[in-house]
Design a protein with these regions (language model features):
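Structural scaffold elements adjacent to functional motifs in cytosolic proteins
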Residues: 52-54
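Short, surface-exposed ligand- or partner-binding patches at beta-edge/loop junctions that are enriched
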Residues: 95
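Rhodanese-like catalytic fold shared by cysteine-dependent sulfurtransferases
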Residues: 2-50, 62-91, 100-134
């Protein structure tokens, strides 16, 4: 085989795999948790159609939080009981200090049967994006 044929064949394979890996850009219709950028999270908060949950400790929540947010402490002994009481059909937005606890909380919420959880990450990023903080 010629070197040119091999080069073209490799190029064609790379192109096929690259096209196959492309995302359509459409939101997934699968229920569950997904990460949103701070700006998108602020837009969701401003729309007022999501229940906003702060999964930090009560002490952290008392220092500053998003206006109207519920405080359900991820590390609290009753976290699982509190999320079990949430309406699984409601859309939720969760956040914490840095994004680590919100990711864990979002997965636990999915496990509890909640279908729509936007993980907004950390409060500092949300504040910089214009979230209403009190």
């Amino acid at each position: 085989m010629s070197r040119r044929f091999i080069t073209l064949a490799i190029f064609a394979l790379v192109a096929v795999f690259a096209i196959g890996a492309c995302d359509s850009g459409e939101a997934s219709s699968d229920p569950g948790a997904y990460t949103v950028k701070p700006e998108a999270a602020v837009a969701m908060i401003d729309e007022g159609e999501r229940v906003v949950i702060d999964v930090r400790t009560p002490a952290e929540f008392a220092e500053a939080h998003i206006v109207g947010a519920l405080n359900i402490d991820l590390d609290g002994a009753d976290f699982a009981d509190q999320i079990a009481e949430l309406d699984p059909e409601e859309p939720y937005l969760v956040y914490c200090r840095s994004g680590n606890r919100s990711a864990v909380a979002a997965e636990q919420m999915v496990d509890a049967g909640i279908k729509d959880i936007a993980d907004a990450g950390g409060l500092a990023d949300l504040a910089r994006a214009g979230a209403p903080i009190v």
